[in-house]
Every structure is written in C-alpha cells, then in structure tokens.
C-alpha cells in the first residue's frame, strides 16, 4: 500500500514538473513573439523617420506633405502649429525609446543559451566582421566597418539637404526675382544660404544628445555604451558648431553689408529672435573651444564646467527658432533630460564605501557595498564624486569587480593621473586615521550584454591602467566557468607597464587566485618598458577599512531590478502628461489669445512647453524612484556592513609565478603576438593609449586575418 502511494506521489511530481516545463516553454515563446513584434515596429518607425528626414529639405515635403499635415493638425485648438512636429518628430522617437526599454527587459529575462549551437556562433561571427576596423585616422580614431557605413549615410543626408537647400537658393533667387530697391543678388543669396546652413545644423542637433544619454535604451538596444558612443557626440558636436557658426557669420556679414547692424539686437515678439540665437551661439562656442584635446586634457575642470552651458545653449536655441521648429531636434534632448534627472536623483545619496587599497604604483582600489540584486556587465563604468575633493566634479572609472562573482561588492580602480585622482591617492596613502569618506555615485553604465563566450580564445591587450576593464571580464568568466554553465575561452592578457611598481595592479585581478587553475585557462604576459629589473615590492598593499554612516546606502539601481520596464513607463507616461498639460494650456490660455487677433508671444509659448516637459519628467521620474525605494530597499541594510574575506583579500604571491611571464626593458611585439593566432574566432580586446589601440586596430583591420574579432575599449575623451 505504501509502495503504491509512493508511486502515485512520484507520478504526481513528474506531472507537476512537466506542467512547469510546458509553462516555462510557453512563457519563453511568448517573450520571443513579443520581441519579434517590437523589432518589426522598430523597423517601421525607423524607416518612417528616415523617410521624413530625407524628404524634409525637398519642395515636395514643404508644399504638399507639410501643407496637408498643417491643414489637418495645425489648426487644432489643443496644439496648434507645434502639433505637427510633436506627431511627426517627437512621438516616434519617444515610442521607439519606450519599445527599446521593453525589448531590453524581455531580453534580460530570457534564459536561452545563445551560444550552444555552432550555427548561432557562425551567425554571430558573420556579423562580427562588420565590427572590424576599417579606418584608423588621427581625427576620427578607430572606425569600424559599421561606423563607416552609418557615417557615410549620415553625411549623405547632410549633403542631400544642403544640395536641395542651395538649389533653391541659386535657382529661385535670380536678378529678375529681386526688387529694384532691394538687396543685391549676392546679399539675397547670402541671406538664403545663412538660413539653409542653420536648417542643416538643426539636423545634426537632432542627433547630438542621443550618444550622451548614458542610460538610454536606444544605445543599449544596438549594443552601444555611453563611453563607446562619446566619439559620435564629438563628431556631431563639431558638425553642429561648424554649421551654426557659419550660419551666424553669414548673417553678421549680411547685416553689416546691408546696414542693418541693429538686427543683431532684435528679439521679435512672434518670429525669429536674433539676440537669442547669438546668446546660444556664444554658449556653444565657449563649449566648443574647450573640447579640443590639448585644452580638454590639460584643463579638464574648465572643459567640465563650461559644458554646463548646454542648458543655456538649448534654452536660447528654443527662444531663437520658436518651440514649433525646435521640436524637430528635441526628441534626443527629451530622452537626455529623463536620463539626466534620474542620474541626479541617484547622486543625492551617499554610498557605503567599506574599504580601500593603496597600491605602490599610486593606484587606489575603492570597495563599495552593493545591493546583491544590482547586476552589471563587464567593462561597465561608475561615475564617482567625492565632495571633500570637489563637490561638482564627477569622474568615470571602470568597475573591476563582477556582480556575479562578488554579489555584495563593487570595486573601482583609480590611477593617480590628474589633480582629482592625485588628491584622492594622497588622502588615502598619507593617513591611517580616515574612518569615513563621503562618496556619491552615478551608474553603473555598460553594455546590456556581452558575447565574449562566443570566442575560442580571448587576447586582451592593455597599457597601464587600461588593464581595469579586463579585470572585470576575467572575474566574470571565472564565475561562468565555476558554474559549468558554459565553456569559457582561453585567456591571454598582454599588459604593458612603465615601471615595475605597476605590476601590483595584477594583484587585483582575482579575489582568490588559489582557485583559478581549476576553472579558467589564463596566461599573463607582462612587459615593463622602463626598467631592466624589478625595483619594487609588489605585495606591499595598504588596506583601509571605513565605518559607513547609517545614512550611507549600498549602491543600488535607481529604478530597481526592473529598471528597463520602469524607464519605458517614465518615458511614455511623462510624454503623455506633457501632452495633456500642453493641450489644456493651449485650449484655455494660448488659443483664446490667438483668436482675439493678439498673437501669443513666441518666447512665452516656448517657455510654457519647456516648463511642461520639465514638470512631466520630474514628476514621473520622482514617483518611479520613490515606488522602487519603498519596495526595493526593504531589508537592504542587513548583512552589508562588513565584507567577507573573499571580498577583501587576494593571494598575489601565487598569481604572478604560476600564470605570469614578466619581460623587463622591452615593449610587446603586438604583430608577432597577434598574427597567426589559432582558432576560428579569436576576440582581440585592447584598452590603453591611443597609439596602442591604433596599432592593434591595424593588425585586426578589415582584410587582415579573418579569425581576429577586434574590440576597442576606450575611456579617453
């Protein structure tokens, strides 16, 4: 009887397990369907947006499309003329960003092994060829095949726009079309050219803020990070300021030649405000002047502080052209505003700094307490602010820990290279009496996912502190290997240092090096370029323990574990609230004034729109943060005051002899070390000085060895 009962129970358990498997499979299938639908919608929206941008400079768009849309939407008592651009330019991009957030949330939840089959690996490697370096130029840096393709398409859009605009200028403005008592031919054409340069500059401005929205779903959905896309912001910024400066100079020449210098101070009540445009241009020029590498690197504080003028630039740009036209280039700025305010909310709290280690190479490792539910990818960065050094300065540093291997700790390594980092090193190295250090952070920011497991082997090339992102990758692979979930690639770390004291950074690679040989296959080739023999004891590491205040919090995601879903909610709900506010104000305030033959002042309309956007973003972001803070931080302060031995200690004595070959007085011959590497897919990662990155890029460039998959990790702005 008992045996029969056990048999029934066993059958019941198998039946229950079968139901669970079927439910899980159905759930994953539903997620896949939703993701495919999102991809389809995204493609439709992108294609529609591209068509609009292509058609915008043509007469067909102005005389037929725009005229038709204004006839249907422009007379609305709720939105008026701005309603057209709200629908055509703002709405699609906000929808796209919201869909991207939902897609990333579903992708994060999916538990499918995408590297199990050879077919998947070959498919990924096929597209990996598009990431190979194609151009290595001083002005552009390292440009991949994909980047060249998109750069050419974007430049084609600008040239197409200029060609259409200039065609209108030189074909329609002729000696016969000019009034007898009006401008000369060259003056009339100069006036028209100035307008067209401004219109083309507005296209670049429309894309300017997307690369610097650090937490944007649009970047993460296409595999970009805020650091890797900073160069796009630089390219776009140079184009914006070149076109806008040319626009301003042309108008200055025109006004001087036509004796209309007083126009420079004009602030039209309902039209274009010249004075506002000049203020915006001056703010832009001040920012632009500090972005050149020689100034930015030598006077980083000047560069940092002057970039806050972007608020002045955008405010007076809107006053200059009016809100209706400004909405064309506003979607990227709107997404940036949401991201910026969320970062502001996160930065208001001090975090728990538990310990620090001071290395002999003037490098500091900071160890923070972390919420175990905060997950981040290798190579992620953290922005750090220490008020006792500077209340305003925020500096990005690579995270060296792994959120999987070290669930309660987050570490960053800071090399003493500038005023801020030198002050921090001096503060920690010269005193044993520091019990507490107030620190605020923003982030982490990094790729939504990594695909290092697809390679047969990984070769990491670093110079100096460029080793930091590779520490996080190695630790992450160590965790993956220890779980036996995937087969990890063979790792070769080629690191170049100036002095033997810099070798102490190798001590931070693993939390516990005694277990490494049983999990991953790693070889370290270290090169000390300026010394023939070791002149430093690498194991002299000073450890400081801090006593966090009760108010200090572990580093946690501002929007909780479902941050992408919350971001989609913020974007969509804030935009809806903004629309409702504008509809009410337009219906009961702006529209009645316009109807009484008194046109509403353009500056006031612009200010109302900007305030409505700000209120909607602040309100929705704050509510989302408070909702997550209430539920997510419950029970957070248990078991986080102290770090376990694994989190603080390492075993440097065993790491160097067993896995490392040290070469003194020579530089690595990268061509010899990289060319001829065996394996169908060899991932080559490089992080270090510009010359080193460019040398590796040339070796792995398009047309070279087909098995080398290049990736540059650069944190140099």
Curated annotation (Swiss-Prot):
InterPro entries for this protein: FAD-bd_8, FAD-bd_FR_type, Fe3_Rdtase_TM_dom, Fe_red_NAD-bd_6, FNR_nucleotide-bd, RBOH/FRE
Catalyzed reactions: 2 a Fe(II)-siderophore + NAD(+) + H(+) = 2 a Fe(III)-siderophore + NADH
Cellular-component GO terms for this entry: mitochondrial membrane
Binding site for FAD: 395-398
Residues at which heme binds: 233, 247, 307, 320
Alphabetical list of Pfam families matching this protein: FAD_binding_8, Ferric_reduct, NAD_binding_6
Classification via SUPFAM superfamilies: Ferredoxin reductase-like, C-terminal NADP-linked domain
Spans traversing the lipid bilayer: 40-59, 86-104, 140-163, 232-255, 306-330, 353-373, 564-586, 606-627
Binding site for NAD(+): 443-446
Obligatory cofactor(s): FAD
Disulfide bond annotation, renumbered to this chain: none
Protein's UniProt keywords contain Electron transport: yes
Family label: Belongs to the ferric reductase (FRE) family.
Note: It is not clear whether or not FRO3 functions in iron import to mitochondria or is involved in iron efflux to the cytosol.
Protein name: Ferric reduction oxidase 3, mitochondrial
């Amino acid at each position: 009887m008992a045996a029969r009962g056990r048999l029934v129970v066993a059958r019941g358990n198998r039946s229950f397990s079968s139901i669970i498997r079927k439910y899980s499979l159905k759930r994953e299938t539903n997620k896949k369907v939703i993701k495919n639908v999102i991809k389809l919608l995204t493609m439709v929206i992108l294609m529609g947006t591209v068509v609009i941008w292509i058609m915008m400079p043509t007469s067909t768009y102005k005389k037929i499309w725009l005229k038709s849309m204004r006839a249907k939407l422009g007379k609305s008592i709720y939105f008026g003329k701005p309603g057209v651009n709200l629908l055509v330019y703002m709405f699609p991009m906000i929808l796209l960003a919201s869909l991207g957030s939902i897609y990333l949330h579903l992708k994060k939840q999916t538990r499918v092994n995408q590297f199990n089959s050879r077919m998947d690996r070959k498919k990924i490697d096929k597209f990996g060829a598009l990431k190979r370096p194609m151009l290595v130029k001083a002005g552009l840096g390292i440009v991949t095949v994909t980047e060249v393709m998109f750069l050419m398409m974007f430049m084609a859009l600008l040239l197409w726009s200029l060609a259409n605009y200039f065609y209108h200028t030189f074909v329609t403005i002729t000696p016969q079309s000019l009034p007898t008592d009006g401008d000369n031919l060259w003056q009339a054409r100069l006036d028209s050219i100035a307008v067209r340069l401004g219109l083309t500059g507005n296209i670049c401005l429309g894309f300017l803020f997307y690369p610097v929205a650090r937490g944007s779903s649009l970047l993460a959905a296409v595999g970009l990070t805020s650091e890797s896309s900073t160069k796009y912001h630089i390219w776009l910024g140079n184009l914006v300021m070149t076109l806008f400066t040319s626009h301003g100079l042309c108008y200055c020449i025109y006004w001087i030649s036509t004796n209309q210098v007083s126009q420079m101070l004009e602030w039209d009540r309902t039209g274009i405000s010249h004075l506002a445009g000049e203020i915006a241009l001056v703010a832009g020029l001040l920012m632009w002047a500090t972005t050149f590498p020689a100034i930015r690197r030598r006077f980083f504080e000047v560069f940092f502080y002057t970039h806050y003028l972007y608020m002045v630039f955008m405010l007076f740009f809107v006053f200059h052209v009016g809100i209706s036209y400004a909405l064309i280039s506003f979607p990227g700025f709107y997404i940036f505003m949401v991201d910026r305010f969320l970062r502001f909310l996160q930065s208001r709290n001090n975090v728990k700094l538990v310990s620090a280690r001071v290395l002999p190479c003037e490098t500091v490792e900071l160890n923070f307490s972390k919420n175990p539910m905060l997950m981040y990818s290798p190579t992620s960065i953290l922005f750090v602010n220490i008020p006792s050094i500077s209340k305003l300065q925020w500096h990005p540093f690579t995270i060296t820990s792994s959120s999987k291997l070290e669930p309660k700790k987050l570490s960053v390594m800071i090399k003493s290279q500038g005023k801020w980092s030198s002050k921090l090193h001096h503060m920690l190295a010269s005193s044993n009496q520091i019990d507490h250090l107030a620190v605020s952070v923003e982030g982490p920011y990094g790729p939504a996912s990594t695909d290092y497991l697809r390679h047969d082997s990984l070769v990491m090339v670093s110079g100096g502190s460029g080793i930091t992102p590779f520490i996080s990758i190695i630790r992450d692979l160590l965790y993956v290997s220890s779980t036996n979930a995937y087969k990890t690639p063979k790792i070769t770390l080629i690191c170049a240092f100036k002095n033997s004291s810099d070798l102490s950074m190798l001590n931070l690679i693993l939390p516990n090096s005694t277990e490494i040989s049983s999990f991953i296959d790693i070889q370290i080739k270290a090169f000390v370029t300026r010394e023939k023999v070791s002149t430093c004891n690498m194991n002299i590491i000073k450890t400081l323990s801090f006593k966090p205040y009760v108010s200090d919090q572990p580093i946690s995601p501002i929007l909780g574990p479902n941050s992408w879903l919350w971001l989609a909610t913020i974007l969509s709900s804030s935009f809806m609230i903004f629309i409702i506010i504008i509809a009410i104000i337009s219906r009961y305030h702006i529209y009645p004034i316009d109807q009484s033959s008194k046109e509403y002042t353009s500056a006031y309309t612009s200010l109302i729109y900007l305030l409505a956007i700000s209120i909607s973003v602040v309100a929705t972001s704050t509510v989302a943060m408070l909702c997550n803070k209430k539920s997510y931080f419950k029970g957070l302060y248990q078991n986080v005051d102290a770090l376990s031995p694994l989190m603080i200690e390492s075993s440097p004595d065993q790491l160097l002899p067993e896995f490392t070959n040290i070469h003194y007085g020579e530089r690595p011959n990268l061509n010899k070390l990289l060319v001829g590497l065996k394996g169908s897919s060899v991932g080559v990662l490089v992080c270090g000085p510009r010359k080193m990155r460019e040398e590796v890029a040339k070796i792995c460039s398009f047309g070279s060895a087909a098995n080398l998959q290049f990736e540059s990790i650069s944190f140099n702005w």
